[in-house]
Amino acid sequence: VASRLRVTELCQLLIESGLNFTWSCTSRVDTIRPGTLELMKKAGCWEISFGLETGSNELLKKMDKAAEVEKSEQAVNWTAAAGIRTKGLFMLGYPGETRETVELTKAFVRRIPMTIMNLTKFTPYPGSPIYRDLYGTNIRDDHWERMNGMNFVWAPDGMTVDELDRHYQDILMSFYQRPKMGLYYASLSIRYPHHLLRLARFGLGFLAAKIRSYVQGR
């Protein structure tokens, strides 16, 4: 959702058409409003993905994100109130990450009413502005096979790759290993058996990718 006007027009057309299908989308947190969300729900929207990134306002500024943590939290709360599921997209290990910002993110993901969380590992891809900031114009090839978003190939000052990996697991577990999340996914699988199969396929695919990444990075 970048333009509320266009989203409103689209939702009204969907409602008027009588088409019966569901859809999901991505959105900025600073463009969403309760009225728009209610209309999106009526038009069939079942999930919105937000690039929340981190629980630290300091890191959000470094990333040139327009929103602050408080605005992100408000958007997620509004979305949940409208009956739409929220997927939070986060990143760990961005330049400036510290143990304190990790704890802020951990507290943030536990606090907001997300239904699914995606945490990626910061990867400075060649050609990107952040890559030039870190390495200059030289292209490194010592960890090329590991630059897939599933491995830490760089660590901020004062942290190590191994420590980032531990924080990565801690953040994910702090969100998913809560009783209410277990109950949520259990009820979802009972209501929609195909969802359980999809989760199993995703889990096996993720495990296979991790094994390949580990073998290639050795």
Regions found by a protein language model. Give the residues of each.
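Membrane-proximal basic amphipathic "stem/tether" segments
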Residues: 174-218
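A structural motif corresponding to the C-terminal lobe/cap of the Radical SAM core domain
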Residues: 4, 10-193
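Acidic catalytic loop of the alpha/beta-hydrolase fold
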Residues: 1
